[in-house]
Regions:
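N-terminal post-signal-peptidase region of extra-cytosolic proteins
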Residues: 44-59, 64-65, 82-110, 152-155, ...
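Bacterial Sec-dependent signal peptides at the C-terminal "C-region" and cleavage site
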Residues: 35-44
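Exported/periplasmic cell-wall-interacting domains
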Residues: 49-52, 110, 114-222
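Bacterial N-terminal signal peptides
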Residues: 24-36
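N-terminal secretory signal peptides that target proteins for export/translocation
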Residues: 1-20
Length: 222
């Protein structure tokens, strides 16, 4: 009979050491795993848009210094996201190619589902103040200024082909696998990597795309 009063000695196998380079790669591998999640099942947010005016109207507020995007409505913050900004985040955007994220009051002027960055919500940059400042400094013509003012006041997409630049918006990560992997490895969140846009994880921008309509006010703080 066995003496069960004594612990049975089991053969122990030596643990294999995990190499240091592999340990360093673990955060990046986890990032890639998150980015590869199928976003097609991401549901609409519980705070879905409930009207175009009054207390129910949503507002997007982006704080560049804190790198946070808030969805506000009904007098409170409904959702907060960590964001990535332009490679040159300090200061307001003033010209095409300056890698800066705009600052000021804007609105969602268009939405694009088939974007190379998964989903794209266009922001109405350049806005009125951008156009007026640029005209006073001689950066754009009077016709360009008037065209921007007209479109913005109509609630439409302003010209994106002036010296002030355009195609600034809220989007996800690239749909191209190689580029998405490259950004994930060398610019992990919250490091800034865009040309001036505001970037979220793909499942996050999917939520915004389904719940934030064209016309939603956008405030971008320094």
């Amino acid at each position: 009979m066995h003496d069960f009063s004594l612990p049975m000695k089991l053969p122990l196998r030596p643990l294999r050491r995990i190499s240091l380079p592999l340990l360093k790669l673990l955060p990046f591998l986890l990032t890639i795993l998150i980015l590869s999640v199928d976003c097609s099942h991401a549901g609409s947010l519980a705070w879905a848009y409930q009207g175009r005016g009054g207390a129910n109207r949503l507002r997007v507020v982006i704080n560049k210094k804190a790198q946070l995007l808030e969805i506000q409505g009904k007098g409170r913050v409904l959702r907060t996201y960590r964001v990535c900004l332009g490679l040159n985040p300090t200061g307001a955007k003033k010209a095409a190619g300056d890698k800066r994220t705009p600052e000021g009051e804007y609105f969602i002027c268009m939405k694009q589902a088939g974007s190379k960055f998964h989903r794209f919500l266009g922001i109405s940059y350049p806005g009125e103040q951008d156009a007026k400042r640029a005209f006073e400094k001689g950066l754009i013509s009077l016709d360009a200024r008037n065209s921007i003012l007209e479109k913005v006041r109509q609630g439409k997409t302003p010209p994106w082909n002036t010296k002030l630049g355009g195609w600034v918006g809220i989007h996800g990560y690239p749909t191209d696998d190689y580029r998405r992997l490259w950004i994930s490895l060398f610019f992990p969140k919250p490091h800034n990597w865009t040309d001036g846009c505001i970037a979220l994880w793909n499942f996050e921008v999917e939520q915004l795309f389904r719940s934030v309509p064209v016309g939603t006010p956008v405030t971008i703080l320094p």
